[in-house]
Amino acid sequence: MKPNMHYTELKDTYLFNTIYRKTDEYLAAHPGEHVLKLGVGDVSYPLCKKVIEALHEAVDDQSKIKTFHGYLPEHGAMFLREAIAKYYSGWNVDMTTDEIFVSSGACDDLGDLLEMFDRDNTVLVIEPAYPEYVDTNLLYGRKVIHLPAGEGDGFLPLPDESIDADIIYICSPNNPTGSAYTREKLKKWVDYANEKDAVILYDAAYEIFIEEDDVPHSIYEIEGADTCAVEVCSFSKT
């Protein structure tokens, strides 16, 4: 048996574990200080009443013969996919339930989706970025190109025609920068992906925080995105 030697290409520790450790060390040395945590997008407050009520109702349903059910469809319960389609319709995105897949979480999908692509594909990651983008591709042995974002471009770099990428990661609004692509700028990425025959893995986990009219909540608001993009969203940030 041969191990996957690509594990040796990973960093010694997961980024967020390092952040937790440094935070704990700082608080131990500076007791009483308030630290703003900008690491993992974890919840900060108790769940709202509506969510708690829905959870209780779902548990109660499992105790009654008329409402009990075992495994749900592998791509998600129909009522949930219908609700998601309705949500997207608010952004003028026409989506059928057959195009919606519900999983155990966005993080899992960002890794699982890679099983559809050959290991020889080149990956483009806009930095700074969620560590999962890089780590999962390193485990597959793929070449990863890092496209730095900085103050000069508003942390929103545009495509470089000299780069031939097959898989492109875009997170908008971005964590940790908070920058978000306008429709005009995101269209440039969509056009680039279609031109290069590439796939955009679009991380829309933070779309609920968008307030500007010219910033799309979904990449599918952009013409041409339906032929080059897979959007991964999460309702855990709402």
Where are the predicted features?
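Conserved core of the PLP fold type I
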Residues: 66-193, 207-226, 230
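Short strand-loop junctions, especially beta-strand C-caps/beta-turns
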Residues: 41-43, 173, 234-235
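Nucleotide-sugar-dependent glycosyltransferase donor-binding/catalytic pocket residues
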Residues: 45, 178, 182, 237
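Glycine-rich "substrate-gating" loop/helix at the edge of Rossmann-like oxidoreductase active sites
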Residues: 7-11, 177, 235-238
